[in-house]
């Protein structure tokens, strides 16, 4: 008898996180359906099943419900599984990272590496009502596959992706610098903003710049996936968790006013230092790359393409043992 699984989508960036898991569920001969919150865009493919009501979910009777977001409906059938929507990089620089907030929604947490597993194991011992399994992140499976298809760009490609957090985003501060570099340097650009980015005035400025410059591609959806990251040579960002994702693809990262800087990235605090940092990143200095790879391993310990398989095994272990 086929097992039924459900994906709970409350944020648009859930789609690229969940699809590798969907592939593994189907590979095992089981079934998966999607439940999408009303205020979340529906970005399903034709072959993906959409349950549009609570009654449909009840009739479907999933054995497990997976959510990359911070909450889930506790009255849905099945084990509630947290997959996370990023890595615990503590972008706000707080003493307490809200990545580790236990809200009482989940039975299982599927952690990624030592930076998430160790704190959640402590929380498991403290609360006792959930289990923690280090599986790796489902989305990381796509990065493993994508690395085999790294393009060789004729000109350096810079991907600019900023966080949506208002007091951290670099977007208002870097516009003039990016505008100048687009016109002066022999680089191509991709610009992408987080789906939650809400400053429409700033967004409009970047869109207008992209429309006026042939060497800029504006990525409308804001969903940064492995293919988009792999198309670039360098990531320019601030404190977004996409930083770790770029590094998983061996892409050096330049940040503006990063809240947790370190030797794994090229962080600048002045706009006039951005150009030199990008040039250095393009050259891929050996020490930077070594530090970057060590940093990635702390966050994602399982870059083997099998994280989705381990997630399903963890659910089976929780249910049957």
Language-model features and meaning:
Residues 14-26, 138-206, 268, 303, ...:
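Conserved catalytic-core segment of nucleotide-activated headgroup transferases in glycan assembly
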Residues 70, 76-82, 222-265:
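A donor-sugar binding/catalytic signature common to diverse glycosyltransferases
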């Amino acid at each position: 008898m086929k097992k039924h699984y459900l994906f709970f989508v409350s944020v648009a960036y859930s789609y690229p996180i969940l699809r590798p898991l969907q592939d593994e569920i189907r590979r095992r001969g089981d079934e998966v359906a999607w439940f999408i919150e009303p205020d979340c865009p529906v970005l399903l493919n034709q072959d993906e099943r959409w349950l549009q009501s609570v009654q449909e979910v009840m009739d479907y009777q999933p054995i497990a419900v997976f959510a990359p977001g911070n909450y889930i409906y506790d009255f849905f059938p099945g084990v509630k599984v947290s997959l996370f929507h990023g890595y615990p990089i503590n972008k706000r620089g707080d003493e307490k990272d809200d990545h580790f907030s236990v809200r009482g929604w989940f039975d299982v947490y599927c952690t990624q590496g030592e930076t998430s597993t160790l704190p959640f194991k402590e929380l498991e011992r403290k609360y006792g009502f959930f289990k923690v399994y280090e599986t790796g992140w489902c989305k990381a499976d796509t990065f493993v596959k994508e690395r085999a298809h790294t393009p060789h760009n004729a000109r350096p490609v810079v991907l600019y992706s900023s966080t949506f957090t208002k007091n951290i985003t670099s977007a208002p501060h870097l516009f003039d610098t990016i505008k100048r570099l687009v016109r002066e340097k022999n680089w191509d650009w991709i610009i992408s903003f987080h789906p939650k980015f809400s400053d429409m005035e700033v967004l409009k400025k970047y869109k207008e710049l992209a429309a006026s410059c042939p060497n800029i591609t504006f990525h409308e959806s804001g969903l940064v996936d492995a293919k988009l990251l792999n198309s670039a040579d360098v990531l320019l960002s601030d404190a977004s968790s996409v930083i770790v994702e770029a590094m998983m693809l061996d892409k050096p990262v330049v940040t503006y006013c990063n809240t947790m800087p370190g030797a794994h990235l090229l962080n600048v605090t002045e706009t006039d230092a951005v150009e030199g940092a990008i040039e250095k990143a393009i050259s891929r200095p050996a020490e930077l790359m070594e530090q970057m790879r060590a940093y990635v391993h702390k966050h994602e310990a399982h870059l083997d393409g099998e994280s989705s398989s381990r997630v399903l095994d963890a659910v089976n272990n929780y249910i049957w043992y």
